[in-house]
């Protein structure tokens, strides 16, 4: 009888214990978190940043993570090619457009005007704005991203396929050094379109659903530039090529890697990829990287950052204002102590954001007139939901000025775990895929928020003090 009573009591307790554990992909810790701090079997509570720990598939280990694999040599396969002068990936600067990496004496507490040149003169045409984008590109590199190298001396690529999985083997050589990496491509079934399959380059595999008829390349961006913590500075394939002292941040190095992938695809027709229809995506820290890649690489047709938060589709000034209103958000001062996503030079400005002659609305402006759709999650205050809404509104003025407002989308909802995809957003996502990768005539007017900012307030007139011009 005692045994029966004991088992009955245990049976009553166990469900409560299980329920007290966070489920797979659920939150299990972080600043201000008061919920479950242990995870269900088969998952481990993983610290993503000081504000958020998540139950990820796997088992706990006390051993440090293994170092990235060494570069692999390119094997012979059905197709290979070498380019001694691969096409330029990141856009350069025109000799007729005056650019500078910094603007001494600049100060503006509001969001800087994207429609004036560095000297204060107005942008009056689309051609003018192309020059303005070159100025913005130089400023972002000068203040926070670090220097983006130009095209390397050579890119060698080969492609092999086994079933529905392809392997793109890439070797990049510059200044007498070489690196190699080999991303895999999930290839749709059936006959490819005449120009090849559209492609999504997914940072660390991505988190969004990809429609049928679109290939997916899994980009191990953390091999290109490590991002464990601040000790990762200067580590990864990119730095093996350009040196550990290169000023490029991890995100800039990731963008450089995306450009080399596109170089390789352009030189490898057997991969049957349409290099005019490429998207890039990632979530959280990798969402920040996807946005940076879309901004720096003009061959990307569609950029899809997911829950990129501070350092992504939010603005530094707005995140600070959100923090000043008493909300626990990631700010510039905190993020530079967390990881190596930005150059060390950015540390000089995080305590005086007013001197930045740009903010991240202008990072997003580098994507225009190409397509950009971003998604945010208001359930997580540290993602700076008010800052995201304000920042994308400021960026939207650029797309509107260029006559392509429907090339820029945004949706901000809650009700799901960080980086878990809510089905309610799939129609908006698919609209952008259908239009910009699958060439369908569909409506992409998507720009919405649930206005759940945790009490933080967005007042547009306090931050956007310019009128949107019509550029021709």
Curated annotation (Swiss-Prot):
Disulfide bond as a keyword of this entry, yes or no, is: yes
Spell out the SMART domains in the cross-references.
fCBD
The record's InterPro entries line, in alphabetical order, gives: AB_hydrolase_fold (IPR029058), CBD_sf (IPR035971), Cellulose-bd_dom_fun (IPR000254), GCE-like_dom (IPR054579)
Q: Which residues form the signal peptide?
A: 1-20
Q: What class of enzyme is it?
A: hydrolase
Has the keyword Glycoprotein been applied to this entry? yes
Listed Pfam families:
CBM_1, GCE_fung
User: Region Disordered: start and end of each range?
Assistant: 62-97
Location(s) in or outside the cell: Secreted
Domain (CBM1) ranges: 21-56
Give the Low complexity compositional bias ranges: 73-96
What is the role of the protein in this entry?
Glucuronoyl esterase which may play a significant role in biomass degradation, as it is considered to disconnect hemicellulose from lignin through the hydrolysis of the ester bond between 4-O-methyl-D-glucuronic acid residues of glucuronoxylans and aromatic alcohols of lignin. Can hydrolyze benzyl glucuronic acid (BnGlcA), allyl glucuronic acid (allylGlcA) and to a lower degree methyl glucuronic acid (MeGlcA) in vitro.
Q: What family classification does the UniProt entry report for this protein?
A: Belongs to the carbohydrate esterase 15 (CE15) family.
Protein's name in the database = 4-O-methyl-glucuronoyl methylesterase 1
